[in-house]
C-alpha cells in the first residue's frame, strides 16, 4: 500500500492530473483499499476497480488453516518457490494466507470502509473446469471442494464488493483463471528482446 501510494503520487506529479483510476488484481485490491482508506489517499483516487480481490476472505483458507501448522508452513514455502519463479522477489505465502481468512478480512473491512468520494466496483471470474489452466488445476479442485466454482484461487463470493459487476466466464471452453486475469502466460510468451 505504501509503494502504491508513492506510485500514485509520482503519476499525479508527472501528469498533473487531479486523480487516478486504479484497476487492482487479487491482493492488490486490498492494498489499494488500505491506501485509500487508511493512508489518506481518497482525495487522489477517482475510482477503484477490483479484479478477483478477496474482499470477504476465503472459506478455503479457513479450512486449510485447520491443518497442522507444520504442513501449512511446508506448503507455504513450496508456494514461495513457485512465486519466485513467477517473478515475486520476496513472497511470504504463510503471512498472506493468514490475511485471507474470513475473520481477517472482516476485520480489514471494518477498518477500511469505502470512501464516499471514490467510485468502487468489483468483478469475479471463474474457470469452467480444473483442466482450464494447468497451473491452477490443483488449487481449482481444492477451492471447488469448499466453495464451488472459482478462478483457481477465489470463489465469486470472496470477491463481491461495492458495485459488484458479476461473474465473468469467458467465451471459450476454458473460462478465465486467476492467471488469465492478468494475462500472465501471454505476457511471458510475447515479451520482446533486443530493443
Protein language model features and the residues they cover:
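Helical cap/lid subdomain of alpha/beta-hydrolase-fold lipid enzymes
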Residues: 42-195
Amino acid at each position: 500500500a505504501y509503494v502504491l501510494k508513492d506510485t500514485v503520487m509520482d503519476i499525479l506529479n508527472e501528469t498533473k492530473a487531479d486523480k487516478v483510476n486504479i484497476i487492482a488484481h487479487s491482493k492488490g485490491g486490498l492494498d489499494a483499499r488500505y491506501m485509500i482508506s487508511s493512508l489518506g489517499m481518497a482525495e487522489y483516487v477517482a475510482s477503484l476497480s477490483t479484479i478477483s480481490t478477496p474482499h470477504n476472505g476465503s472459506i478455503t483458507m479457513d479450512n486449510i488453516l485447520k491443518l497442522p501448522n507444520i504442513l501449512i508452513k511446508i506448503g507455504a514455502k513450496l508456494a514461495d518457490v513457485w512465486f519466485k519463479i513467477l517473478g515475486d522477489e520476496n513472497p511470504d505465502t504463510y503471512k498472506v494466507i493468514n490475511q485471507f481468512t474470513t475473520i481477517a478480512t472482516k476485520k480489514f473491512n471494518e477498518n477500511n470502509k469505502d470512501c464516499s468520494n471514490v467510485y468502487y466496483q468489483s468483478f469475479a471470474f471463474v474457470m469452467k473446469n480444473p483442466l482450464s489452466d494447468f497451473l491452477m488445476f490443483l488449487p481449482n479442485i481444492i477451492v471447488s471442494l469448499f466453495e464451488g466454482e472459482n478462478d483457481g484461487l477465489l470463489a465469486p463470493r470472496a470477491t463481491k464488493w461495492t458495485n459488484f459487476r458479476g461473474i465473468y466466464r469467458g467465451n471459450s471452453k476454458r473460462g478465465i483463471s486467476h492467471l488469465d486475469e492478468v494475462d500472465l502466460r501471454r505476457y511471458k510468451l510475447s515479451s520482446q528482446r533486443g530493443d
